[in-house]
């Protein structure tokens, strides 16, 4: 397998892995209210980079699914859309975190079978 093909394959698999985890990360961060820029900045500070072109469609989708609530407010003479978890979002996040913990535990046993 050529280096370019190997690199492309890795990048595609990495993106696939990150997609689901980004949802969990965004939901978890939105236990506390954020607007898009601060959400992106806080996630980046925690090691999770997310492009604007990925974040804003994700926020809209999660809101459409009833997992987020949002409202427009003026802050420092600028209108900003603030997002936070809805009650349904909190319930789903709790379930997703339990599922993630189970998957992590299983993967640890698979990857490190003798420990």
Q: How would you describe each model-predicted region?
A:
Residues 56-61:
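Short, hydrophobic-biased segments on the C-terminal half of alpha helices
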Residues 65-79, 84:
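Beta-hairpin "wing" of winged helix-turn-helix
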Residues 91-115:
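Amphipathic alpha-helical dimerization/coiled-coil segments
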Residues 14-54:
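N-terminal helix-turn-helix DNA-binding core of bacterial DNA-binding proteins
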Residues 1-15:
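Short, Lys/Arg-enriched N-terminal segment that forms or immediately precedes the first helix
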Residues 79-97:
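Basic, amphipathic "hinge/linker" alpha-helix immediately C-terminal to the N-terminal HTH DNA-binding motif
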Residues 32-35, 64-65, 89:
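Short, charged/polar surface micro-motifs in flexible loops or helix N-caps
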Residues 41, 63-64:
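Alpha-helical residues within the helix-turn-helix
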């Amino acid at each position: 397998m050529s280096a370019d093909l190997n690199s492309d394959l890795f990048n595609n698999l990495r993106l696939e892995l990150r997609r689901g985890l980004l949802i969990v990360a965004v939901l978890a961060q939105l236990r506390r209210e954020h607007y898009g820029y601060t959400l992106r900045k806080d996630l980046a500070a925690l090691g999770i980079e997310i492009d604007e072109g990925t974040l804003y469609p994700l926020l809209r989708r999660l809101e459409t699914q009833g997992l987020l609530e949002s409202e427009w407010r003026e802050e420092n003479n600028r209108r900003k859309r603030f997002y936070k978890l809805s009650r349904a979002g909190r319930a789903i996040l709790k379930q997703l975190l339990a599922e993630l913990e189970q998957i992590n535990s299983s993967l640890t046993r698979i990857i490190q079978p003798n420990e």
